[in-house]
Amino acid sequence: MAVGKNKRTSKGKKGGKKKVTDVFTKKEWYDLNAPKMFMVRKFGKTLVTKTIGKKLATDGLKGRIYEVNLADLNNDEDQAHKKIKLICDHIINRDCYTDFCGLSITRDKLCSLIRKGYTLIEGCTDVKTIDNYHLRMFCIAFTKKRPNQTKTTCYAQTSQIKKIRKKMVDIMHAEASKVLLKDLVKKIIPESIGKEVEKQCKKIFPLQNVLIRKVKILKRPKLDISKLMELHSDPKEDSGKNVKSLPESKEATNILTAELKH
């Protein structure tokens, strides 16, 4: 046996201890601000890597999309079936200012609406708002039993479905093309568009559970920071009180006239 150096004993231990570094020391938190169309203005926080050299932290935040439940934004549990998408557009200090970027309903809500014996009618269309937002809106509706109906099912005919779908598209165009995006969101949240569809389609076939299923933004206009800050600014009321003008005394007027004569 050759006598020599044992290579194994001279080598250091395999997989030595590595330095444990806390990843969060390189991160920082930013507050998320929702537009004033929602009740809760600060809806959460987001994490981003700190500014290192030319790589700015704000560049990593711009364009981030956050999906928030509408029940959390409006403090209303009845709106828990809707999800709102907000996109980060502008950062000031540690505040991220967001804008509306989409809407959808939850999967469990959609599954709870679909039933046997009823017809599901869906219509979608591309619309353009006054402030040049290009949207794709999806509307769904379900047939409803007529009063005093003995038949267990209530299926609509193909001709009726086509008429209802056309009405849906026309109403969505009429409601969206004449308003700003913020006003359209205010219409979608309380389902005023769905109620209008239900009202106008009543003569064709009675409907129920008519709602905007999804809103997708296809194209956004160029970012205008002044308009974005208007969405986040609260209108300030003038706190000053009206002061009544006091009538001048006769003595004061006599002194003034005497000075003018001299």
From Swiss-Prot:
Region Disordered: start-end pairs: 234-262
**SMART domains in the cross-refs:** Ribosomal_S3Ae
Q: List the GO molecular function terms.
A: structural constituent of ribosome
Query: Does Ubl conjugation show up as a keyword for this record?
Result: no
GO BP: translation
Q: Which InterPro entries match?
A: Ribosomal_eS1, Ribosomal_eS1_euk
Full protein name: Small ribosomal subunit protein eS1
User: Which organism's genome codes for this protein?
Assistant: Plasmodium yoelii yoelii
